[in-house]
């Protein structure tokens, strides 16, 4: 955002005597400070001259320019707004004011100021970005057509590609510019950032190294390096990369401090999230998403939903997270509407051209079919990236359910037993599906042991019902009878007696057929005696008679 220098910024023939000159100390010229990008020094010089009455024309514009490049947008705004109130205000001031509004997030004001400026490439680039902010595709394409094959315009286009998740298109532009301008080192950071977004973390590191060799203390580059380490290794390795930043970040670079604090929360697995992330929600875009993830991990689905419900998703990550939150809330509330919204979000991402062949895209399609209960389709997608998630508990949980739901309970059992998370292993969905797998795989005793480890609750009652009914269907009458016996004691429902009676008769038949040990009859009689039904005595009499005839001790 360079200001026109049609009028000299320093020394227009007016000579002033300065006491410090007499002492032989040379005051630096504004041009020298600007060429060195010493914006703090430039502001100091301009304010000093203003204070001693040596203020020159356009001083306020130069202060605004320097403040803008220091990231002090409020100060820049103050200077530019004052400049627009002057007579014969240069129309170029309006585009500088508009850029300042833009960086303050005041997009409506930025657009109004931008249209007051004279037409220029900078004005077009600004309006191009505003059209993206407003999701106005018609205006976006209109300003896109005005872009020229010059570096600034092409960088602006690459930026829009990046923000629209068109990372490869952005990379192509950056690489083309770098071919002719090797000195534009910072473009390597942009390329590395694109590769990071494409999940090519090792490639991102290689490209980033080119820049860090020349600028080893770059805040943005070191932060990106830390993020790559987080993805490639773990949070501890990433935190080590940030240590030098935490030690050296200047007090004036407040955004860097906020970025570091934000990323440390992520690297530490959410530690300190409630203290750090809420104030950053409207400062760092990812802060809102990471706070939502934190709430989900704490099982606070309602808070997660409250934080994301008004967010209009524009990136795959935002669509995915809205899908996850709606799915979780739908399950918690039994809401079909939320489940349908989740399914639509997942389908939108998984079916998009840019995401369909990525792992997140395939995860979305698996989730979509999971919600539709089309488990054969779920497995097609899960199998396509299974090798990347062998030790991932969440993947194994979903994979096991899909396998069990399609009747492959043997592989379902294997996947369930790979899960390490104690929280997940105590979840009723896990317990009920694993119990079902055990029963279908002719291991009813293991299913019964799952129940014995549970405390008395509504969930343990439900698991008893599952064991009782599924064991009955599978002809595993002994554990079916035991389950129906406990159910009958907890709830004198006639249906439980009928189930228990049928299971006991089933065991008796299996004993007669030699498919069950004769000693089991003693326990069957014990189960029957615990019921006060009139049919019990008749059943016991028949069983005792058979036992006597077959010399079975009861």
Curated annotation (Swiss-Prot):
Coiled-coil ranges from the UniProt annotation: none
Keywords: Cell projection, Ciliopathy, Cilium, Disease variant, Protein transport, Repeat, TPR repeat, Transport
GO CC annotation: centrosome; ciliary basal body; ciliary base; ciliary tip; cilium; intraciliary transport particle B; neuron projection
Pfam families: ANAPC3
Main location per the UniProt record: other
Domain of life: Eukaryota
GO molecular function: intraciliary transport particle B binding
Family: Belongs to the IFT56 family.
Disorder cited: Biliary, renal, neurologic, and skeletal syndrome: An autosomal recessive ciliopathy with multisystemic manifestations including severe neonatal cholestasis that progresses to liver fibrosis and cirrhosis, postaxial polydactyly, hydrocephalus, retinal abnormalities, and situs inversus. Additional features may include congenital cardiac defects, echogenic kidneys with renal failure, ocular abnormalities, joint hyperextensibility, and dysmorphic facial features. Some patients have global developmental delay.
Record-given protein name: Intraflagellar transport protein 56
Protein's organism: Homo sapiens
């Amino acid at each position: 955002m360079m200001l026109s220098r049609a009028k000299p910024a320093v020394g227009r023939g007016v000579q002033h005597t300065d006491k410090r000159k007499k002492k032989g100390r040379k005051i630096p010229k504004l041009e020298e400070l600007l060429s060195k990008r010493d914006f703090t020094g430039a502001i100091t010089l301009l304010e000093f001259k203003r204070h001693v009455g040596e203020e020159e024309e356009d001083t306020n514009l130069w202060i605004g320019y320097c403040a803008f490049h220091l990231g002090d947008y409020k100060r820049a705004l103050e200077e530019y707004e004052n400049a627009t109130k002057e007579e014969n205000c240069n129309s170029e001031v309006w585009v500088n004011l508009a850029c300042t509004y833009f960086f303050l997030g005041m997009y409506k004001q930025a657009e109004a100021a931008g249209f007051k400026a004279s037409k220029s490439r900078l004005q077009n680039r600004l309006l191009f970005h505003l059209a993206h902010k407003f999701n106005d595709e018609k205006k976006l394409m209109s300003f896109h057509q005005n872009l020229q094959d010059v570096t600034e315009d092409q960088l602006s286009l690459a930026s829009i590609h990046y923000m629209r998740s068109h990372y490869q298109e952005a990379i192509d532009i950056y690489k083309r510019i770098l071919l002719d301008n090797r000195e534009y080192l910072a473009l390597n950071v942009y390329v590395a950032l694109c590769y990071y977004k494409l999940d090519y973390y090792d490639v991102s590191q290689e490209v980033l190294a080119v820049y860090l060799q020349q600028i080893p203390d770059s805040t943005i580059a070191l932060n990106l390096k830390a993020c790559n380490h987080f993805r490639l290794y773990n949070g501890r390795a990433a935190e080590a990369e940030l240590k030098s930043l935490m030690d050296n970040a200047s007090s004036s670079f407040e955004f860097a401090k906020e970025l570091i604090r934000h990323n440390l929360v992520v690297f530490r697995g959410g530690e300190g999230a409630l203290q750090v992330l809420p104030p950053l929600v409207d400062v760092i875009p990812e802060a809102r998403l990471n706070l939502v993830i934190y709430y989900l991990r704490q099982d606070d689905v309602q808070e997660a939903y409250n934080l994301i419900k008004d967010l209009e998703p524009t990136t795959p990550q935002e669509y995915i997270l809205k899908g996850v939150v709606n799915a979780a809330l739908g399950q918690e509330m039994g809401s079909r509407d939320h489940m349908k919204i989740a399914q639509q979000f997942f389908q939108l991402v998984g079916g998009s051209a840019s995401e369909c062949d990525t792992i997140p895209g395939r995860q979305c399609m698996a989730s979509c079919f999971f919600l539709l209960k089309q488990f054969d389709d779920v497995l097609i997608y899960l199998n396509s990236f299974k090798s990347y998630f062998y030790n991932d508990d969440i993947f194994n949980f979903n994979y096991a359910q899909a396998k069990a739901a399609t009747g492959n309970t043997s592989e379902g059992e294997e996947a369930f037993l790979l899960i390490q998370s104690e929280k997940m292993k105590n979840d009723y969905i896990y317990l009920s599906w694993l119990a079902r797998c055990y029963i279908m795989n002719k291991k009813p005793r293991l299913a019964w042991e799952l129940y014995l480890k549970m405390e008395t609750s509504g969930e343990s009652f439900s698991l008893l019902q599952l064991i009782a009914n599924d064991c009955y269907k599978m002809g595993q009458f002994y554990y079916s009878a035991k389950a129906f016996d406990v159910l009958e004691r907890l709830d004198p429902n006639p249906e439980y007696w009928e189930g228990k009676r049928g299971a006991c008769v089933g065991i008796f038949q299996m004993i007669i057929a030699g498919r069950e040990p004769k000693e089991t009859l003693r326990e069957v009689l014990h189960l029957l005696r615990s019921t006060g039904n009139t049919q019990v005595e008749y059943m016991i009499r028949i069983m005792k008679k058979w036992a006597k005839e077959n010399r079975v001790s009861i």
